[in-house]
Amino acid sequence: MARSLWTGSLSFGLVNVPVQLVSAVRDLDLHFRQLHAKDDMPIETQRVCSKEGKEVPYEEIGREYDGVVLTDEELSAADPAKTRTIDIESFVKLAEIDPLYFDHPYYLIPAGETDGTVRAYRLLAGVMEQSERAALGRFVLRTKEYLVAIRVRDGALALSTLRFHDEVRDTDGIPGAGGRTKPKEVKQAVKLIEALSTDWNPEGYDDEYRKRLQAIVRKKRKGGEIKRPEADPERTQPVPDLMAALEESLKSYA
C-alpha cells in the first residue's frame, strides 16, 4: 500500500472512523531530465529578475495576481483552519455525480486495526454500497480545503476530490449539442453502438505511448537507430453521406 498522505477521522453524525489517506493511483509516466545537448550536463532552473538579470533568493520572491502583489503572510489569511476531520455533509446517489466533477482519486483505509475502528469502517462501507450512495464532505490537505466524494470500491472507501461547479464548463456554444436528428440515422447509429458494445475491462487497454517510449529507450541503450514511423493518414473531412457511412460500418461488424 502507498504511504499515508493524511491521517485523521471520517465523521458522520456522532460516529468517528480513524482513517488514513493514500493515493489510489501511481505515476508510471517516463520522466526525462533536461540536459545540455552539447555536453549532456543537467539543466538547472534559476529564478532571475527580468530587470536586474540576477538570481533572486527565495525569501525575496513575492506573488502577484491581477496586478495585486501579496506577501506570504497576506496569502496565509485565506488558509482554512487545519483540521484532522473529514466532515460528511450529505449523502447523494452516486449515479447523480457527473464524472466531469471527479478529480484525483484516493483510498481511505482504517487507521489502526482495533476492532472498533475496523467495525465502524466496515459498517459505513457496507451501508453506502448497499444504498448506492456517495458521501459528500470537506477536508483540508496541506493548506487547501477540498470538496470530496467518498464511495465504495471493492469493499474499501475510495475518496475523490471534486471540482467545484464554476470550474466545469457548460456545453453552451458547442455545435451539435442537442438539436434534431433523423430517425433512420439514429436507428443505424444505435445498431453500430450495440455492435461495438462490450464489458468494461481495464486490463484490455494499455498505455501504448508509454510502451513505445520504453521500447525507444531500450533500443537507444543498445546503440540502435531511432526512426520516426510514417503516420497514418488522418480522417478529418466530414462524411458526405452519414447514412451510407453508418451502413458500411455495420457491414464490417456483421
Regions found by a protein language model. Name each.
Residues M1-A254:
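Boundary segments of small protein-protein interaction reader/adaptor domains
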